[in-house]
């Protein structure tokens, strides 16, 4: 019963937690027989919430296109594959460090940066925001002209990873 109660509370289903506690106290074996159904429903709810959260975060990140590391051709690039895979764990973000990709047009900088952002959302539950530098500067200028300076900066401070 303990794991069901913690699942109810983790999902903020406090009314169900109280009802389950009452049912198990009064219902005995009939209630225990339906335990598998409740466990299955809780797992489905948890999975659905995770998937909706990922979908929301992917939309909020505003990536130009969806890219991941599986789609990057390391054979055609001089990029250190081991280093990129190491960066994908996002430990640099936890340590408040920056990563800068330098290279000419078409070398995969945006692809790799987007892939790190996608990895951050899907595997590490990070909040990510992608901006082209030109779009960010324009948005900051518009914000300043509207007399609302600082709102974008406050929004970016809430992010775990900002990609420019």
Language model regions located:
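Interdomain "pre-motor" coupling segment immediately N-terminal to P-loop NTPase/helicase cores
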Residues: 9-64
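Conserved P-loop
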Residues: 53, 81-158
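Short hinge/gating elements
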Residues: 6, 19-26, 70, 97-103
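N-terminal pre-Walker A segment at the start of P-loop NTPase domains
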Residues: 67-88
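Conserved AAA+/SF3 P-loop NTPase catalytic/coupling segment centered on the Walker-B
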Residues: 160-164
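Extended, charged alpha-helical coiled-coil/arm scaffolds that mediate oligomerization and mechanical coupling
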Residues: 1-7
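Alpha-helix C-capping/helix-to-loop hinge sites
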Residues: 23-27, 75, 143
């Amino acid at each position: 019963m303990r794991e069901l109660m913690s699942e109810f509370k983790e999902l903020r289903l406090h009314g169900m937690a109280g009802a389950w506690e009452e049912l198990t106290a009064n219902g005995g074996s009939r209630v225990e027989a339906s335990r598998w159904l409740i466990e299955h429903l809780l797992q489905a709810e948890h999975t659905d919430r995770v998937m909706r959260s990922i979908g929301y975060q992917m939309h909020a990140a505003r990536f130009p296109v969806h890219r991941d590391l599986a789609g990057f051709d390391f054979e055609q690039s001089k990029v250190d594959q081991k280093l990129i895979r190491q960066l994908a764990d996002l430990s640099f973000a936890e340590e408040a460090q920056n990563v800068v990709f330098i290279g000419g047009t078409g070398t995969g900088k945006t692809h790799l940066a987007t892939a790190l952002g996608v990895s951050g959302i899907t595997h590490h539950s990070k909040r990510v925001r992608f901006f082209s530098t030109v779009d960010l500067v324009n948005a900051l200028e518009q914000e300043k002209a509207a007399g609302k300076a600082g709102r974008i900066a406050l929004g970016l401070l809430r992010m775990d990873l900002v990609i420019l």
